[in-house]
Amino acid sequence: MTRDAANILFTRLSQSGDEAAITELHNRYFYRLYKLAYSIVGDKGAAEEITNDVFVRIWEKRSLLKDVVSPELYLLKCARNRALEFLRGQKMDIILSEDDLHDFPLQWEVSPEQLLISSEMVRQINKVIDQLSPKCKLVFLLVKESNLKYREVADLLHISIKTVEAQMAIALKKISQAVPMTFLHH
C-alpha cells in the first residue's frame, strides 16, 4: 500500500468513521504488524491478540488520526508499543525465537533473472538471516521485508540511524560471505 493510500484511509477513519477503511487497513497491515509483534513477544497467540488490539485501539481513537503524518510508521509503533506493554504485563524478556521465526521466511520479489537462483541459495540466505543476533535480524527484516527507511527503523526501535546502518552492514556482510557473489549479482 502506498503512503498516500494509507493517508487516505486514516483520513476516512478520522473524518467519517468509515468501517470499510478500518477493514482495509486490517487486511493490508495485519501480517506486517503481526510479524513485528511476534518478533518481540515470541508467541503466536499473543502476537495475534496484540495485532488485533492495535486495530481495535485505532478504531477507538480514530478521531485523533487526522494528525498522523506517517500512518504506516504509526501502525508499526502502535504494534511495537503494545507488544512491549504485553511483555511488561507478563514480566517477560524481549525474545526472538529462532525456531519459530522459520514460519516467516523473507519474501523475495522474483524477477526472471532471480528465478535462476536455486532453492538452495534461498535456503542459504535464510539460514544466515536466522543466525543473526535478534537485534540485527529485526533491523534487517524491518528494512528489507517491511521496506522501512533507516530513519523509520531508528525511530521505531528508539536507536540511532548509525546503529541501524551498523546492523545492516553486519547482516549484509554475513550474507555476502555465505553466498557466492555470482548469485548476488543476478
Regions found by a protein language model. Name each.
Residues 63, 80-97:
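Arg/Lys-rich amphipathic alpha helix in sigma70-family domain 2
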Residues 127-130, 134, 138, 142, ...:
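Helix-turn-helix DNA-binding module
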Residues 35, 49-56, 69-81:
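Structural recognition of an alpha-helix C-terminal capping motif at a helix-to-coil junction
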Residues 2-3, 12, 95, 124, ...:
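C-terminal edge and immediately downstream basic/flexible tail or linker adjoining helix-turn-helix-like DNA-binding
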Residues 15-23, 35-51, 184-186:
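Short, charged helix-capping/linker segments at alpha-helix termini
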Residues 15, 55-70, 90-91:
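Sigma70-family region 2
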Residues 3, 93-115:
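Internal acidic/polar
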Residues 1-32, 113:
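N-terminal module of bacterial RNA polymerase sigma factors
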